[in-house]
Amino acid sequence: YANATPFYGAVVACVDEPMVKRILPDISRPVITYGFSGDAEFQADCREYREIRSTFLAKNRKKELGEINLNVPGAHNIKNALAAISLSIEMNIDFEIIQKGLKKYSGVKRRFEIKGIYDDVLIIDDYAHHPTEVSATLRAIKNGWRRRLVTIFQPHLFSRTKHFYEDFARSFLISDVLIITDVFP
């Protein structure tokens, strides 16, 4: 798949993912790497999570580019921002424009969507339907708020639930309380 990239293109890859790192030597196209790992070309340093915001210092080959302020929480969103930064820099977009654009981004519907606060309880709706997404979302909550986390989960599809039930179980260990509803068929 990566080798199908046109000769004028590049593959943007997160080196924090072991499977991605393993296939890098097999990619014949130019590769741009990002992640928290020290061997990534684009890195995030001095990461801070405060409620719905994430802040980090963006670096390119260890050289500081500047601070990025995101209006979405979590390490996974910082990695998404690093991917966008690396691609934007590759396309010669000015870093200040990248900063402004990322600061304006506030997420998409049903992904960490704050529904309201009721009796000092923050209600968040998130359509995480894979264990990796569930873990990332719950970790973002734990890192940003440092409060008790009650999770209500509605599994989608019997086949997915059966296939990933052990991974789902591990992902929910982050929660203080877990409520599981009926499977949505």
Language-model regions, residue ranges each:
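Acidic, Mg2+-coordinating active-site environments of NTP-dependent enzymes
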Residues: 1-123, 146-147
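Switch II (G3) loop of P-loop NTPases
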Residues: 123-129
